[in-house]
Amino acid sequence: MKHFLRMLIQVCLYFYCKFLWRCLKFVMRKLTGRCELQRICYNTKPGASRTMKIETSLRDSKSKLLQTSVSVHPDAIEKTIEDIMELKKINPDVNPQLGISLQACLLQIVGYRNLIADVEKLRREPYDSDNPQHEEMLLKLWKFLKPNTPLESRISKQWCEIGFQGDDPKTDFRGMGLLGLYNLQYFAERDATAAQQVLSDSLHPKCSKFSKAEWEKKRMDKAIGYSFAIVGINITDLAYNLLVSGALKTHFYNIAPEAPTLSHFQQTFCYLMHEFHKFWIEEDPMDIMEFNRVREKFRKRIIKQLQNPDMALCPHFAASEGLINM
């Protein structure tokens, strides 16, 4: 009974607050002569702050046109803006900047949704050793990470040298599908020097090679190693969940002036790999069993950063050269 009453109170509060909000919007329109979309565009700077407010306003609108505008095809955005202006009785000749601002916001909103679909498609596609394209990508990954060491055979224990668990990497891609391979190859190719350095650092000796006394004295270079490829796939999972949950909207809306693309997502992965590697060293774990603890602490730190509407995960490395700040 208590649970039912609590739920009833929450529902009542929701509708009460919604009613008050609609009343406030009505009053503001009468006082300013502007609709909510106009007030947001004129009073909020470009970037995540503006786009997220526009997205909320469109999604929560009573109008079906506004509700569906966040999921239209990119080619229909311009026509959708015209329909919104007509619905709101806004003269585009008197308010020329409004249409431009709304279009920029919708490009980001629709682009983010499409990016999720593109990333999800890669995640759901399993690695197929009979697919020449998949095999070529995998062999390129080795070449980029170990340019001076030939791979003796496709099935080889050498794969463990770059952090796979066995002699055939395809089994390690089951969780993230092709997305994990795409990200690893992107990092290894676009930021080869850094990727090779991170790989080298990940091969640090384990603490078992030292006595307890020696380990306590060795403060500067004692970081526990980790499996580079496996961690890369794990960080891919982190990036994927940040994307799907909407946490990355802040970042993408601040760095992509139009629609965020797969390249933006891969650049974000590179940034997360860099930052996780530094964070791992800072945390100074005693053994690899602490990976989940370190990873969760890192996830919370990234999410906290992304809660700042002005936040952009600004990477400073080769793979980020294509980023355009707003």
UniProtKB/Swiss-Prot annotation:
Coiled coil: none
Pfam families from the UniProt entry: ELMO_CED12
Bilayer-spanning residue ranges: none
GO molecular function: GTPase activator activity
ELMO domain location: 133-306
UniProt keyword list: GTPase activation
InterPro entries, sorted: ELMO_dom (IPR006816), ELMO_domain-containing (IPR050868)
Presence of the UniProt keyword Cytoplasm in the record: no
Purpose: Acts as a GTPase-activating protein (GAP) toward guanine nucleotide exchange factors like ARL2, ARL3, ARF1 and ARF6, but not for GTPases outside the Arf family.
Protein name: ELMO domain-containing protein 1
Designated gene of the protein: ELMOD1
